[in-house]
């Protein structure tokens, strides 16, 4: 039941991401970095549920485009701290707004009560709770 919805969501988001030349993982990284202060690659990977080696290519690409920056960690010479740049925040905001407009169109098919219930249950599921 969830798989068809997920496929439709991904199909709806892919053109938005492509229009802004960002991958799904790149967008996830920008979202995570915008929600918190600088973090290490390992902490970021844990926060988004990815292996730290899996996101290296995405981090390299985001850095090359000036969307994130990597700085040496003053407390650990082996680690680099990651932060979103103003340009990265601009891209993240544009993608997020377009995706949210698409979600609003989908949710517009639901009554107010259905929408409230759907969002509550979805929030519970994504938080790992039992509805």
Residue spans for each PLM region:
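Conserved residues at beta->alpha junctions
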Residues: 3-4, 86
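Hydrophobic structural patches
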Residues: 2, 30-33, 122
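N-terminal helix-turn-helix DNA-binding core of bacterial DNA-binding proteins
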Residues: 7-54, 65
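Conserved alpha-helix in the HATPase_c
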Residues: 57
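Charged, amphipathic alpha-helical coiled-coil/dimerization segments
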Residues: 10, 38, 42, 60-123, ...
């Amino acid at each position: 039941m969830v798989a068809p919805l997920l496929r439709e969501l991904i199909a709806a988001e892919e053109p938005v991401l492509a229009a802004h030349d960002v991958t799904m993982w790149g967008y996830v990284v920008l979202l995570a970095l915008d929600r918190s202060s600088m973090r290490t690659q390992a902490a970021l990977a844990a926060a988004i549920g990815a292996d730290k080696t899996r996101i290296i290519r995405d981090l390299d690409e985001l850095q090359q485009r000036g969307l994130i920056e990597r700085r040496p960690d003053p407390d650990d010479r082996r680690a680099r701290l990651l932060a979103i740049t103003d340009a990265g925040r601009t891209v993240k905001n544009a993608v997020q707004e377009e995706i949210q407009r698409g979600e609003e169109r989908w949710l517009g098919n639901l009554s107010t009560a259905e929408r409230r219930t759907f969002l509550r249950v979805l929030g519970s599921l994504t938080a790992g709770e039992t509805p």
